């Protein structure tokens, strides 16, 4: 009878080891996915920052053109 108990215990230990191994593999896969997602987030963050800078530059350029246009309109009014 003790041999049967030993076999059951051995079987349960093996199942536990198999489960642990599978969970470790899953953890590694999730870590890799997490790293890939972190890189994707960093790339998106950098793209966003570049777009914000470009937007600011375009706003400044627009403001400059508006000032030039106002100056030209002012000169046209003076001529009339």
Swiss-Prot record:
Q: Which UniProt keywords apply?
A: Cell cycle, Cell division, Coiled coil, Cytoplasm, Septation
**Cross-referenced Pfam families:** ZapB (PF06005)
Q: Does the keyword Cell cycle apply?
A: yes
Q: Which GO terms describe its cellular component?
A: cytoplasm
Q: Which residues form a coiled coil?
A: 3-80
What GO biological process term is on the record, naming one? FtsZ-dependent cytokinesis
Q: Which Gene3D superfamilies match?
A: 1.20.5.340
What domain of life does the native source organism fall in? Answer: Bacteria
Subcellular location as annotated: Cytoplasm
Sorted alphabetically, which InterPro entries does this protein's record hold?
Cell_div_ZapB (IPR009252)
Subunit composition? Homodimer. The ends of the coiled-coil dimer bind to each other, forming polymers. Interacts with FtsZ.
Q: What does this protein do?
A: Non-essential, abundant cell division factor that is required for proper Z-ring formation. It is recruited early to the divisome by direct interaction with FtsZ, stimulating Z-ring assembly and thereby promoting cell division earlier in the cell cycle. Its recruitment to the Z-ring requires functional FtsA or ZipA.
Q: Which HAMAP family match?
A: ZapB
Q: Which family does it belong to?
A: Belongs to the ZapB family.
Protein's UniProt name: Cell division protein ZapB
Please give the organism.
Proteus mirabilis (strain HI4320)
Name the gene for this chain. Answer: zapB
